[in-house]
Curated annotation (Swiss-Prot):
Encoding gene per record: glyA
Pfam families in the record: SHMT
One MF annotation (Gene Ontology) recorded for this entry: pyridoxal phosphate binding
Example GO BP: tetrahydrofolate interconversion
EC category name: transferase
Protein name: Serine hydroxymethyltransferase
Length: 427
């Protein structure tokens, strides 16, 4: 063959370039994604990607880690400052990996856990079919108040006292409002339970002081991914405060328990992102919440059924829309149609949906964190709502709208709230 296997290399590069061109022409509203700054991209593409470093800085099992160690130690300091934690472990390579470490380090098979149900926004790693189940935990779910779109405090307190679980888990993937940590953490402590908070979706909002800080509300351990409202590379983190002697069990579960090398190029990217958030995080997080509220209000004005009207729709980056009145396939119809128009988001189960509706759920989950980072403000949210109305309610040809969306995105290509581009002009 004349070109041998080089044609495969060329095809991969072609797809990479096509993806980057396409993605930069869309309005990306996936609530679990974001875009990294040029500085973070530099770290992620650095020679750290070739290096191994098992164990702790300056106590490695590999030689040649002197620069890696310095970066990781800077990261520990920055994350502790950012979140007010006693320690930050940057080694988990994803949010699920961080959750695995907690479950394997602090519980035993047969222990009871209370988590958020999938339909109520619980993450798959908390489920019997996820990391919690793989650990052999007996998984129970929080009582949920559909009207409040939150955990039912009174019933939850009763459940904790009845079950006496080993661990309770707050946080989730559908997360428009803070969870009642202050109210329920003391009850969990009464029965000797660990209190864990999965901050994957809201880590950047916590860093920017726009959401509850779980470590100040009674949480023992906070886990997170580092690439949603916290706009870093894909990875994970564990933070804890006043945790006591069980730290050693948790750290042993991380290494050698659920990982060896911890993807040092991504670790370096996390550290730069922490510095960005210390510098710009409060303004970034505040604009995210402003944009989310503005988008929710605009969608309601355009005729959509937006969840949480009586609670000002949202206190996070997420906007939840019920589209079951627009089509029998609901979110399973709406999300692919919007993708044809260059508007990217995901279908989502709502609290009243049975699990059997996972492919045709009632809801759409929308996140504004990425479009906020490329400089969009409240007025842009009104334009996005109009694009969505034209596709889903007016039934316009999505390909026609896609061309307008691509033209619209041309003005929003820089990554702001970063040392590379500073703040958007209005800021």
């Amino acid at each position: 063959m004349e070109n041998g296997y080089k044609t495969y290399r060329d095809k991969v590069i072609e797809y990479l370039e096509a993806h980057e061109k396409w993605r930069s022409s869309t309005i990306n509203l996936i609530a679990s994604e974001n875009v990294t700054s040029p500085s973070v991209n530099r770290a992620v593409s650095s020679g750290f990607m070739h290096k191994y470093a098992e164990g702790w800085p300056r106590q490695r099992y590999y030689q040649g880690c002197k620069y890696v160690d310095e970066v990781e130690l800077i990261g520990v300091d920055l994350f502790c400052k950012l979140f007010g934690s006693d320690f930050a472990d940057l080694r988990p390579i994803s949010g699920t990996n961080a959750n695995q470490a907690v479950f394997f380090g602090l519980t035993q098979p047969g222990d009871k856990a209370i988590v958020l149900h999938t339909s109520h926004g619980g993450h798959i790693s908390h489920m019997p079919f996820g990391a919690a189940g793989m650990r052999g935990l007996e998984v129970h779910t929080w009582p949920f108040d559909n009207e409040e779109f939150n955990i039912d405090v009174d019933k939850a307190a009763q459940l904790i006292r009845e079950l006496e679980p080993r661990i309770v888990v707050f946080g989730g993937s559908l997360f428009p409002f803070p969870h009642p940590v202050k109210e329920l953490a003391p009850v969990a402590k009464e029965v000797g339970a660990y209190v864990m908070y999965d901050a994957a979706h809201v880590l950047g909002l916590i860093a920017g002081k726009q959401f509850q800080n779980p470590l100040r509300e009674g949480v023992d351990i906070m886990t997170a991914s580092t690439h949603k409202t916290f706009p870093g590379p894909q990875g994970g983190i564990i933070l804890y405060k006043n945790f006591g002697d069980d730290v050693a069990k948790l750290q042993w579960a991380i290494f050698p328990g659920v990982l060896s090398n911890h993807h040092l190029h991504h670790m370096a990217g996390k550290v730069i992102t922490a510095a960005e958030m210390l510098e710009f995080g409060e303004r970034y997080a505040a604009q995210i919440v402003k944009n989310a509220k503005a988008l929710a209000e605009a969608l309601a004005e355009e005729g959509f059924k937006v969840i949480g009207e009586d609670k000002d729709y949202t206190e996070s980056h997420q906007v939840i829309v019920d589209v079951s009145d627009l089509h029998e396939a609901a979110g399973g119809w709406a999300a692919p149609l919007l993708e044809e128009a260059g508007i990217i988001l995901n279908k989502n189960l709502l609290p009243w949906d049975p699990l059997e509706k996972v492919n045709t759920p009632s809801g759409l989950r929308i996140g504004v964190q990425e479009m906020t980072r490329v400089g969009m403000l409240e007025d842009n949210m009104k334009d996005i709502a109009v694009f969505m109305r034209r596709v889903l309610i007016d039934k316009e040809d999505p390909k026609k709208v896609e061309k307008e969306v691509a033209e619209y995105r041309k003005e929003y290509q820089k990554v702001y709230y970063s040392f590379d581009h500073g703040l958007p002009m209005k800021e």
